[in-house]
Amino acid sequence: MRVRSLHALHGVFSRQVTPAVDLSDLLRAEVVLGVSALDHYMHELTRLGMLECFAGSRKNTEAFDRFPLPISIAGALSNPSTAQAIIEGEIRSRHSFLSFQHPDRIAEAVRLFSEVKLWEEVGKHLGTTAKEIKTALLLIIDRRNKIAHEADIDPSYPGQRWPIDSNLVERTLDKLQEIARAIFKVT
């Protein structure tokens, strides 16, 4: 994840400046970027999986078969040299406004190319339960949303931000990466 470079930058800066310089917003940016990386990864994995279904190298799922396509592209799909590019464009277009961050949305995306019971299999792969994995991801997403939409302000103490430190961010990034790798492995 590119966000690891930002984490390293925070580490370098924190050793070179006094505590009077608040670097916590770098950490907050890392959380936002980490979730963004998972979202992007899920978009790419879904697009590629759906293209494999279209090409016949992966078994179609019910969700794939129900994926809506405009009638206007029917003619273009009959041309093998352009069909894949047309389908790819439609997938990108239909998914461009969707977010694949919440566990339910991620599972919906995976169902477009795989019949796997996603969170059960991810939990097994990671030696835990589906509930624990989804809860961990939801906590990360909730924190990301507090940062992105609420300026990470603690409503109990107006003007004060929720605490954050390098270890919390490192664990967050590790968990996101662990989940992404497990999703790849089980799909």
Predicted regions and their residues:
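Non-transmembrane, amphipathic alpha-helical segments
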Residues: 18-30, 34, 129-132, 161-164, ...
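Helix-loop junctions and short alpha-helical segments
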Residues: 33-34, 41-133
